[in-house]
Curated annotation (Swiss-Prot):
Residues 1-58 form the HTH lysR-type domain. InterPro entries: LysR_subst-bd, Tscrpt_reg_HTH_LysR, WH-like_DNA-bd_sf, WH_DNA-bd_sf. Keywords: Activator, DNA-binding, Transcription, Transcription regulation. The keyword DNA-binding applies. One of its GO terms (cellular component) is protein-DNA complex. It comes from Pectobacterium carotovorum subsp. carotovorum. Signal peptide: none annotated. This is Hydrogen peroxide-inducible genes activator. Residues 18-37 bind DNA. Belongs to the LysR transcriptional regulatory family. Required for the induction of a regulon of hydrogen peroxide inducible genes such as catalase and glutathione-reductase.
Length: 302
């Protein structure tokens, strides 16, 4: 038994499909299947039920998967401890980002991070919050940049900046001549929202419910750009995070208005596993991003 065998087993448990598990491990399906059988022979127990077309784990298999996850997390810690003995800001770093942050934040920080930490090899992974937290917990990610939610409280959260949300309306909307909109004015309105799984959806819905607004259930978007295009087409209004909003008050048929009483906003944070030996690396990374974004966010509020 070796570490690679445990990685195969955990991948199979996550994907419940031999080919997809093999692809995620960058090996052929016969290689992964063969190693799982060898693991069963070595342990003397059946880990999988092979009477079904589905991948079903036996009770012994499920127990071994959980223990394998623990072992792999500890191996990750050992590697981090070894890395800590060298230069803190060098070597590989796997960073996760949510889709409503990544496309808009990365152009602002990546060139700066490359200049500041030239020896840092950054690998960027985009996924929804629940997926990022699972990958962070399993050790696949070193840290993640996301909007703080209840589920992220199990990790160390380092706030980076607060990001306001702006109301996006079509250019012929009755409110298009306003300078800003009170949240109470949204009472009775129906807003376009992202589909389930996006934390921004839950946050925006919360602000809308407080204001007496509701969701337009005729359509749910997969991305902010789809929401923007639906607004431009006159199909509704929505809340968009400030980083995704252009500096112009109006562009491409969409008018962007600040909201107040209260100002809807979310906190963007860098999160990492508690007890990580590379805490100094993550804190330094967070400090650098926070300092850079502080000035940028101030320009957006003007």
């Amino acid at each position: 038994m070796n570490i690679r065998d445990l990685e195969y087993l955990v991948a199979l448990a996550e994907h419940r499909h031999f080919r997809r598990a093999a692809d995620s491990c960058h090996v052929s399906q016969p290689t992964l299947s063969g190693q799982i059988r060898k693991l069963e022979d070595e342990l003397g127990v059946m880990l999988l039920e092979r009477t079904s077309r589905k991948v079903l784990f036996t009770q012994a298999g499920l127990l071994l998967v959980e223990q394998a996850r623990t072992v792999l997390r500890e191996v990750k810690v050992l590697k981090e401890m070894a890395s800590q003995q060298g230069e803190t800001m060098s070597g590989p770093l796997h960073i996760g980002l949510i889709p409503t942050v990544g496309p808009y934040l990365l152009p602002q920080i990546i060139p700066m991070l490359h200049r500041t930490f030239p020896k840092l090899e950054m690998y960027l992974h985009e996924a929804q919050t629940h997926q990022l937290l699972a990958q962070l917990d399993s050790g696949k990610l070193d840290c993640a940049i996301l909007a703080m939610v209840k589920e992220s409280e199990a990790f160390i959260e380092v706030p980076l900046f607060d990001e306001p949300m702006k109301l996006a309306i079509y250019q012929d909307h009755p409110w298009a001549n306003r300078e800003r909109v009170a949240m109470s004015d949204l009472a009775g309105e129906k807003l376009l929202m992202l589909e389930d799984g996006h934390c921004l959806r839950d946050q925006a819905m919360g602000f809308c419910f407080q204001a007496g607004a509701d969701e337009d259930t005729h359509f749910r978007a997969t991305s902010l750009e789809t929401l923007r295009n639906m607004v431009a087409a006159g199909s509704g209004i929505t809340l968009l995070p400030a980083l995704s909003v252009p500096r112009e008050r109006e562009r491409d048929g969409v008018c962007y208005l600040p909201c107040y009483k209260p100002e809807p906003k979310r906190t963007i944070a860098l999160v990492y596993r508690p007890g990580s030996p590379l805490r100094g690396r993550y804190e330094q990374l967070a400090d650098t991003i926070r300092e850079h974004m502080q000035g940028y966010m101030e320009t957006l509020s003007k």
